[in-house]
Amino acid sequence: MASIKSLAALVAAMGAALLPAVAAQCANLTPVSQPQLAPGYSAKLILNQLSDPRSLQFDSLGNLLIVEQGGTGIRYVKLTDKGGVNVCVASQKQLIPNGNLTHGIALSANGKTLYASTATDVLAYPYDAAAGTVGQARSIINGMAQTGYHQTRTLLIPKDKPNVLLVSRGSAPNLDLPTAEASSGRSQIRAFDLNKLAGGPVPYTSGEVFGWGLRNSVGVGENPKDGGIWSVENSLDDMERSGVDVHNENPGEELNYHGSYKGARNPLKGANYGYPNCFAVWETSTITGVPNVQVGSQVIQGSPSGNVTDQYCQTVPVAPRLTFTAHTAPLDIKFHPNGRSAYISFHGSWNRQPPDGYRLSKVQFGANGQPTAASTSKSAEIKVAWNSDNAVCPGSCFRPVGLAWDKKGRLFMVSDSTGELFVLTVPA
């Protein structure tokens, strides 16, 4: 009688045989919505029929790992490189069959431990890049269960500090008032020493507060040139001020700077960025009663309460480094390998008219590691790839989510609404 292991191997082999053939994946695929591209860019659809793809991670051998939020887990994709956008899927298989995985993924510096997140836990798996296999999962961080829509737990291991895992957790409801205290454990980024997570899981609230007052910072990235950590904020829905609805154009989405994790004298480590009390202005004309209000100024929503006033918002919390159009929903930020630009996926709106977002954009950075645009700018965002008609969104257009650079400087991007994976070449 065959052993359990041999039967398992047979089942795995049969499953692999059912995957699409190489030739089929190298065929010309037609996108649901052909991206419009800025001059100098090229793009190609290389994989479709993904199940709500979210985050991307290249392993040490150039294999691409895709988190699929649609109850699938993590997919392992081997690529054939023919230069430029001529990239084909050589093979693919299910790496982790865990339907509870929601978004986050990261690899240890040596490439041998894979981290992934559910809504409640961060899991660690022994990982073999060559074989495309994982070992038994173990929970290393727990205690993140909450109600509401914000169930992603973004993960980042800074290259400047490879023993640290940053975990971003959003609010529960739209306006989560208890997060006015960092001890709530929500609407913040916490840091964990991986060297101390070899035993049982630790609660999320035991991590070091790296930044708080961050409503739902799904995208967290590192500038490779100076180690600066940046996040992109999905801000408040249905904003009003003293009973007046201002939500269509306010508040703006945010690009926030957290400094470098390795910096012993980083003054931004543990800083408060304002939520749930303060929100960045995008359209100044609808914000009344605030002298000299500018794009990026932080103001209250609702009515003043105690010490929480517009003046408080403009003097106490850290203001965003840049502000973007309201409700465009930035979900990832990845820096070009030269550190001179950051690419941001804007998933797109549900809470404004006309619809906006649904695009990939970039922000230019200078040699000092900061955006070249002023914090009051409305033109810092440079569109890279977009839909030709946002009126058909969100139902019939691409909605970018996860981004990843390969070793040749190409940018890979997934669209969750259409289940697609694109590769882009960028200008020198």
Question: Which sequence ranges carry the predicted segments?
Answer:
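Fungal secretory targeting signals
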Residues: 1-24
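Beta-propeller domain segments
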Residues: 25-32, 36, 171-174, 184-205, ...
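A short beta-strand motif characteristic of beta-propeller blades
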Residues: 43-48, 90-97, 138-144, 205-210, ...
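Beta-rich, blade/repeat-based domains predominating
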Residues: 49-61, 97-113, 117, 145-164, ...
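Conserved beta-propeller blade signature
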Residues: 63-67, 113-116, 164-168, 228-232, ...
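Short loop/turn segments immediately following the C-termini of beta-strands
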Residues: 68-70, 117-121, 127, 170-172, ...
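Asp-box/WD-like beta-propeller blade repeats and closely related beta-sheet repeat scaffolds
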Residues: 92, 101-102, 120-159, 171-173
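Blade-level signature of beta-propeller repeat domains, shared across WD40, Kelch, NHL, RCC1
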Residues: 251, 402-428
